[in-house]
Amino acid sequence: MEDAEVVLRRAPLFDGLDEESARALRRQMSDVKLSRGEHLFLEGQDGDRLYVVLDGKIKLTRAAADGRENLLTVLGPGEMFGELSLFDPRPRTSSASAVTDATVAALGHDALRPWLLERPEVSMHMLQALARRLRRANDVTADLVFTDVPGRVAKNLLDLAERFGEQDRDGLHVHHDLTQEELAQLVGASRETVNKALADFAARGWLQISARSVLILDIERLRRRAR
């Protein structure tokens, strides 16, 4: 497990702060430990704080009209979430729960607002993070319309590999910690269709499939399939 202070410095909230300011802001935060499957907040609840993942993985989900759960994203150490309610104080638009045992650092909006007023650069970094998230959401929407399921599977595996992959001489190990159903939700397709795509990739020698992880053997082929 990485040192919490090192992880926090990767978050947009701390980007650009000097050491003294970063320590002062850290003192305003409280740590929350979650067991696997435990909810941090639910869609529709009022939001009064943002969070940074210190350890483990957090997933953000949203309920569909028919009651099914849609997996929006999986977040790892250094990634921030829950900040939307700071700029738009309406109920939460998603639920957050632990994919693995996890620890997050929480910062209340009342403690954060003075920092944003005194340090416009912090506000700018947070807005840039929101812009990146919006751009990603637009890409996901476009993929659902224009990209076939195998292409979306490849693209999501590459995204997970970029954030959670560990390279060794065997290949790129991606411990995503997702069930088959969760991976299908992330892709936006049925579990059967996603499993068929994964089996095809494995048969071609591009990857090996394990429980809640994959070993990528030919990342270039996977990149071409994601285009």
Predicted regions and their residues:
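Phosphate-/nucleic-acid-contacting segments
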Residues: V149, N156-R227
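Cyclic nucleotide-binding regulatory module and flanking cytosolic helices
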Residues: M1-R36, S85-L86
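Cyclic-nucleotide recognition modules
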Residues: T73-R135
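Amphipathic, well-packed alpha-helical segments that form the structural scaffold of globular domains
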Residues: R26, S30, Q128-A131, R135, ...
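Short aromatic/basic micro-patch
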Residues: G16, L50, V74, A106, ...
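Long cytosolic regulatory regions associated with cyclic-nucleotide signaling
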Residues: M1-V6, E19-A22, L84, P91, ...
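Cyclic nucleotide-binding regulatory domains
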Residues: L13, E38-D101
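A generic structural signal for short hydrophobic patches within well-formed alpha-helices
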Residues: A22, L112-R113, L222
